[in-house]
């Protein structure tokens, strides 16, 4: 918000409504004022904002002088006669002057003075007897001008002829006549006019009836209305401003109820003089008053949005409404220099102007258009030290977004061809719902209700939009054909619609693929129609001489044999071969044309045997007309001699050499099968004519030689021979070979497509169609570029080509559905299907889109369009039996930002633990009500366990009967801990409110003694350290920490134990069974492996000199049968327990300040309140012993241990110990520095994880195994397994599992790869009883189980 320009004039103004001059302003010298130079002249000037000019003054465009001054100036709308409108002035002498702005703009304004030329003055109207106070043009009829004067008269001027304006009275003079201060036309109803009087009355005039419609007056206040404006959109609401200093109020009246105003806005301290309603936003209303304040109001909420002032600074608009309560004058020294007029620009929404009595017209913008920094400083006053202080100006902001900055409407495309359209409807006001009560203006609740009723209602319309109408229509037609199976009819329609021979041939070949006699139809499309050829042969035979035989070939009897009774020769075994007409011998037996030459020799031998076996007398005598003579020619005699002696080979050879091929073939046929074949081969080798080579291929059935050596220009003849003679299996292969030659050698793609269609090769056909489509698109792109058309045309053509391709492929695949090789799609076809499915999905055809996405098996395509597949599947309910695709995104557990990483890992472990080890907690929950104080950390539900773990990780030390504090109080809790006095073992924490004894951490074991119930305080007992100070977190402990106490150096000295005091009263609890050496407590083992302790090992004394308790009150010491196997690390007598081993100090947990900073980390420091040791890593089971999770190697034994110890044996073991060992817990992720203590003692830390090569190999084998099991059994089980295994793949890829877990998983996967699913199942069962289950996660482990089950079912 900023001030743009100013005019050094004491004038009344009017913005230009002309679209050609949106930033022009008419300025007329206002009456009743005088300048510093005592100039009494009057001018009418036109200024331009001209923001390109850096000057702060507006640019003068034209001016003219006037004989009298102005009370009001108004610039009217354009008309047919005056394109730039008319400027009207309410003159002080009682006249209405009219100017032509076109002539004023044409005047010379270079000198800055007014021109005395009165040519721009086009008319003067004189009806008022006193000064004219206000004028206003009718919005809907620019020829009507209303005027009101100090003579209490209102006139309507007709400006049809502005040179002679005529005036009429709208009605009789009102009884409450007074000076007319303002007139205003209704914005919606053209014949309604309002006028305001100085006596506080508002009169509504009706020009149709020429009378007063109503009179409005505030009975409670003596308002003197100075300005009125009609509501821009509500025809019955008018707003009036009172200039009375006692009642500076702005009132909104509704004509339907004039008892009281519907709104009253109070903010000015003195009378309000000017009002202006924003034409672009009905909620913005400007007001200016004698208190030197100009406010911008939110009319709907009746609140001040900002104050507009001229303080010669950058920020001229102040948004602090409280400034209205101040008495300052915003930098103006003269309190009387207030703005008397304010106006919005009708063309530029953000522009407004003010006119003041200080001789300035200021122009402001609600938007900040200055280039200066918003934090710029303006010079301030000198302070007491004489230094000039800089005062920064804060850029104010209006809490209302103007309508011109709001989108009136908008649209957004959604998935599935949806479009969401929003817009703003008309306001629902109180006036539309009925009359307003008189008390509505004074009640705050009703004001809020009014504001809510006036809120704009926004409605969102969701529609379905189809941008590719032709594609959707073609797709629906194709889906209908596939559903009904009317393929031939569909192909015929495509043939009729085709404009090129190529398309007709393709659709014709596709059509014959559905016919029973498809190969005969192919012959027809190749141009070899059988009936036509027969006619041609008949005509050709008529031109040849007749044979010198008694009966011709056409007279041979042929019997019409039914197709079912015909023998099935080789070339007519299926419907795909040509049904040739049968050849019948003299015995009416059908003879196979292909085997005729092969059987001729055997038939001849048979006839000879029959002739020799029969006697001459049995034969019928033959009649010969010509005696038989032996040849006399020398060549024929030699052939005859060879026949006479039975040398058929020589006879045939002689015939071949003499060129008598027919005689050679006849003699070879009579001689036998072997000679017949030799003669046949010799004949084809001698005869090298094209005809002979074709006949050779047919007779020898060497069609592969034909398709590989035939001239490609005769490809149709070659394909016809294949259709006629080739077996069905060879036909497809040979057709593909012929297509390959046409594609690669001749680059004849059109002919190659037809051959591939005959071969049923979808992949190669699609490849050629794709290449043809790309060539077609390149040609179109070049043509469109040269013609200058839009690229949208190219996209539409590309979509049409894709639709044509999908139609052909769909029909082709339907014709070849019997071939199993066509069930999978190659990469090219997969991409085409996916692209087409994406187009269908964008058009809202989700069912068809899903059908094209389902058969895609290409991995690259599935990865690229996996999101689309999942989205389409979820968006439609018509799944058509298609299984749900895998989720394309990775599932990630989201935790709170203030939750520690250890806690997140612990939560994941607890989730898996509840699934994998639920049976281990059943017995504990059964005894919960009996031992809730002794084993509270064991029997709590998972939520409470998690809270305890969080408290331990955050380092809080809660006493037994103290509720846990929230995580947000962690830091405050640490401060309290540093100031708490040490709590001794014999103090109140040993008792609870119920006087039930709670076992302490450092209580000594009591052998064969009654339990210690209520102990008196132990005097002189040193405090016991429960934990190490935080200074030892990443530092080696002091040297004394590595040495045992003095009492541990003597093996013969018994352990030091505290003697319990006798209880003062009876115990409230039954004494638990005591311990003895003959019945040791059971070992606690939850890690899955065997654990035992050497019987000769003595009990181990902790660093404080007291043996750890064996928990004599625990039911686990007495009831062994009801307890699950426990972890030996939890046994207090186990030397592997870190608390029992003084030689193995461990780093304390992080974020656990036990002492104030700067304190000594030695043992003699007073301990904090008791708290179990903090768990540094994730665990697989709830800890029985807080120290069970410390990393301690099992191959290190403490030196100089006592020799006397009860015998401890492990009563449980796990079969998983044979294959897998329990992994050590992961190191603390918060401890960035390696443990120095571990390095000094030679402790080996657990491995970080598998290598990159191992993980990649694992993931590859798992993905391959998943794909191999796809489609063998239940698809739902496979989908579930695939979904679960994706999480395992993510874990392995990120190395979120330990090396031990990876080794176990790799063993299972190796068995799956080797198809040894029984072994994989056994290995899996072993893992379920180990913590590896919880580390890997139940989801991933169940996924492996699903794969194993699928393998067992399929094998």
Curated annotation (Swiss-Prot):
It is found in: Cytoplasmic vesicle, COPII-coated vesicle membrane; Endoplasmic reticulum membrane. Residues 1230-1252 have a biased composition (Polar residues). GO terms for cellular component: COPII vesicle coat; endoplasmic reticulum exit site; endoplasmic reticulum membrane. WD repeats lie at residues 5-48, 65-109, 127-167, 175-215, 220-263, 267-307, 334-374, 412-463. Its main location: membrane. Belongs to the WD repeat SEC31 family. The COPII coat is composed of at least 5 proteins: the sec23/24 complex, the sec13/31 complex, and the protein sar1A or sar1B. sec13 and sec31 make a 2:2 tetramer that forms the edge element of the COPII outer coat. The tetramer self-assembles in multiple copies to form the complete polyhedral cage. Interacts (via WD 8) with sec13. This is Protein transport protein SEC31. The lineage of its organism: Eukaryota, Amoebozoa, Evosea, Eumycetozoa, Dictyostelia. The gene is sec31.
């Amino acid at each position: 918000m900023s001030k743009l320009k100013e005019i050094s004039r004491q004038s009344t103004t009017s913005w230009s409504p002309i679209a050609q001059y949106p930033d022009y302003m008419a300025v007329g010298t206002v009456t009743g004022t005088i300048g510093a130079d005592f100039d009494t002249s009057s001018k009418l000037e036109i200024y331009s904002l001209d923001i390109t000019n850096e000057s702060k003054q507006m640019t003068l465009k034209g001016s003219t002088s006037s004989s009298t001054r102005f009370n009001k100036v108004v610039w009217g709308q354009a008309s047919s006669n005056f394109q730039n409108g008319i400027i009207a002035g309410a003159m002080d002498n009682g006249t209405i002057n009219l100017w032509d702005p076109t002539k004023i703009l044409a005047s010379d304004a270079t000198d800055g003075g007014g021109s005395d030329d009165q040519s721009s003055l086009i008319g003067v109207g004189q009806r008022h007897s006193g000064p004219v106070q206000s004028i206003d043009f009718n919005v809907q009829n620019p020829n009507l001008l209303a005027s009101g004067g100090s003579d209490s008269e209102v006139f309507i001027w007709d400006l049809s002829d502005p040179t002679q304006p005529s005036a009429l009275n709208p009605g009789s003079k009102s009884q409450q006549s007074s000076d007319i201060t303002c007139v205003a036309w209704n914005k919606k109803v053209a014949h309604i006019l309002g006028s305001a009087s100085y006596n506080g009355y508002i009169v509504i005039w009706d020009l149709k009836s020429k009378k007063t419609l109503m009179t409005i007056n505030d009975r409670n206040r003596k308002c003197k209305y100075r300005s009125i404006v009609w509501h821009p959109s509500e025809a019955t609401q008018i707003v009036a401003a009172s200039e009375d200093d006692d009642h500076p109020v702005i009132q909104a009246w509704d004509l339907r109820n004039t008892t009281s105003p519907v709104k009253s806005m109070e903010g000015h301290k003195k009378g309000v003089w000017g009002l202006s309603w924003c034409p672009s936003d009905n909620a913005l209303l400007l007001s200016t008053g004698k208190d030197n304040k100009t406010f911008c109001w939110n009319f709907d909420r009746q609140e001040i949005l900002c104050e507009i002032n001229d303080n010669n600074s950058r920020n001229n608009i102040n948004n602090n409404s409280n400034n209205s309560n101040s008495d300052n004058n915003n930098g103006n020294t003269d309190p009387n220099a207030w703005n008397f007029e304010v106006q919005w620009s009708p063309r530029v929404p953000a522009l407004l102007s003010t006119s003041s009595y200080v001789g300035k017209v200021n122009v402001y913008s609600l938007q900040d258009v200055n280039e200066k920094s918003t934090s710029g400083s303006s010079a301030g006053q000198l302070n007491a030290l004489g230094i000039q202080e800089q005062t920064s100006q804060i850029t104010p902001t209006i809490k209302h977004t103007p309508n011109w900055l709001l989108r009136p409407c908008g649209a957004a495309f959604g998935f599935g061809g949806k479009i969401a359209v929003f817009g703003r409807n008309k306001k629902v006001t109180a006036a539309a719902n009925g009359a307003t009560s008189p008390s509505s203006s004074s009640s705050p609740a009703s004001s809020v209700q009014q504001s809510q009723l006036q809120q704009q209602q926004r409605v969102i319309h969701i529609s379905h939009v189809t941008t590719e109408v032709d594609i959707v229509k073609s797709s629906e037609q194709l889906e209908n054909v596939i559903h009904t199976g009317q393929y031939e009819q569909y192909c015929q329609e495509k043939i009729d619609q085709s404009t090129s021979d190529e398309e007709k041939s393709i659709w014709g070949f596709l059509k014959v693929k559905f016919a029973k006699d498809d190969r005969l139809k192919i012959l027809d499309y190749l141009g070899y129609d059988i009936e036509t050829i027969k006619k041609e042969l008949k005509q050709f035979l008529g031109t040849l001489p007749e044979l010198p035989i008694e009966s011709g070939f056409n007279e041979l009897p042929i019997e019409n044999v039914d197709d079912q009774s015909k023998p099935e020769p080789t070339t007519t075994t299926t419907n795909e071969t040509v049904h040739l007409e049968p050849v019948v011998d003299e015995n009416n037996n059908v003879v196979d044309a292909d085997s005729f030459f092969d059987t001729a020799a055997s038939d001849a031998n048979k006839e000879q045997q029959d002739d020799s076996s029969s006697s001459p007398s049995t034969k019928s005598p033959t009649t010969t007309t010509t005696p038989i003579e032996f040849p006399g020619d020398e060549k024929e005699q030699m052939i005859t001699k060879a026949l006479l002696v039975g040398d058929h080979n020589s006879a045939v050879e002689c015939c071949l050499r003499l060129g008598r091929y027919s005689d050679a073939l006849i003699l070879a046929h009579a001689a036998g099968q072997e000679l017949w074949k030799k003669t046949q081969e010799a004949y084809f080798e001698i005869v090298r004519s094209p005809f002979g080579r074709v006949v050779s291929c047919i007779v020898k059935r060497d069609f592969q030689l034909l398709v590989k050596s035939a001239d490609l220009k005769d490809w149709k003849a070659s394909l016809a021979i294949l259709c006629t003679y080739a077996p069905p299996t060879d036909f497809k292969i040979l057709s593909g070979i012929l297509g390959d030659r046409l594609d690669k050698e001749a680059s004849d793609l059109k002919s190659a497509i037809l051959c591939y269609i005959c071969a049923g090769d979808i992949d190669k056909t699609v490849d050629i169609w794709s290449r043809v489509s790309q060539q077609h698109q390149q040609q179109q792109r070049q043509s469109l570029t040269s013609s200058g058309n839009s690229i949208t045309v190219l996209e539409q053509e590309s979509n049409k080509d894709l639709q044509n391709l999908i139609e052909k492929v769909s029909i082709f695949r339907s014709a070849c559905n019997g071939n199993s090789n066509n069930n999978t799609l190659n990469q090219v076809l997969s991409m085409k299907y996916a692209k087409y499915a994406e187009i269908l999905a964008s058009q809202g055809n989700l069912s068809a889109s899903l059908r094209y996405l389902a058969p895609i098996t290409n991995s690259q395509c599935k990865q690229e369009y996996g999101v689309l597949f999942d989205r389409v599947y979820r968006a439609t309910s018509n799944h058509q039996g298609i299984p749900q695709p895998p989720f394309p995104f990775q599932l990630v557990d989201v935790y709170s930002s203030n939750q520690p990483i250890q806690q997140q890992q612990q939560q994941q472990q607890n989730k898996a633990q509840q699934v994998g080890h639920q049976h281990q907690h059943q017995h504990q929950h059964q005894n919960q009500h009996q031992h809730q104080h002794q084993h509270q950390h064991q029997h709590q539900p998972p939520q409470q366990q998690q809270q305890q773990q969080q408290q331990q990780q955050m380092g809080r030390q809660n006493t037994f009967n103290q509720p846990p504090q929230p995580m947000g109080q962690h830091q405050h809790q640490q401060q309290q801990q540093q100031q708490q006095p040490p709590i001794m073992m014999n103090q109140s924490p040993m008792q609870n409110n119920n006087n039930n004894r709670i076992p302490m951490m450092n209580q000594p074991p009591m052998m064969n003694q009654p339990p210690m119930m209520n102990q008196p305080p132990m005097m002189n007992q040193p405090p016991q350290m429960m934990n190490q100070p935080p200074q030892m977190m990443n530092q080696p402990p002091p040297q004394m920490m590595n040495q045992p106490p003095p009492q541990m150096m003597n093996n013969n000295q018994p352990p030091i134990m505290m003697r319990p005091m006798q209880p003062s009263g009876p115990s409230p609890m039954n004494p638990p069974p005591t311990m003895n050496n003959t019945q040791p407590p059971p070992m606690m083992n939850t890690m899955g492996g065997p654990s035992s302790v050497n019987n000769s090992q003595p009990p181990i004394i902790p660093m404080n000199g007291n043996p750890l308790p064996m928990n004599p009150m625990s039911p686990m010491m007495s009831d062994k049968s009801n307890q699950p196997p426990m972890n030996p690390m939890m046994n207090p007598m186990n030397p592997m327990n870190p608390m029992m081993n003084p030689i193995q100090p461990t780093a304390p947990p992080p974020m656990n300040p036990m002492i104030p900073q700067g304190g000594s980390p030695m043992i003699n420091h007073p301990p904090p309140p008791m708290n179990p040791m903090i768990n540094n890593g994730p665990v697989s089971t709830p800890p029985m012993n807080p120290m069970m999770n410390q990393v301690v190697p099992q191959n290190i034994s403490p030196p100089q241990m006592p020799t006397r110890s009860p015998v401890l044996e492990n009563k449980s073991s796990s079969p998983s110990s044979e294959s897998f060992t329990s992994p050590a817990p992961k190191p603390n992720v918060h401890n960035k520095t390696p443990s120095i203590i571990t390095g000094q003692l030679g402790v080996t830390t657990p491995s970080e994880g598998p290598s990159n090569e191992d993980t990649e190999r694992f993931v590859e084998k798992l993905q391959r195994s998943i794909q191999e099991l796809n489609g063998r059994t239940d698809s739902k089980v496979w989908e579930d397994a695939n979904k679960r295994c994706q999480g395992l793949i993510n874990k392995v890829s990120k190395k979120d599992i330990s090396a031990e877990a990876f080794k176990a998983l790799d063993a299972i996967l190796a068995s799956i790869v080797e198809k040894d699913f029984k072994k994989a199942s056994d290995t899996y069962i072993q893992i379920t009883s180990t913590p590896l289950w919880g580390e890997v996660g139940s989801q991933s482990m169940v996924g492996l189980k699903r794969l194993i089950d699928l393998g067992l079912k399929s094998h």
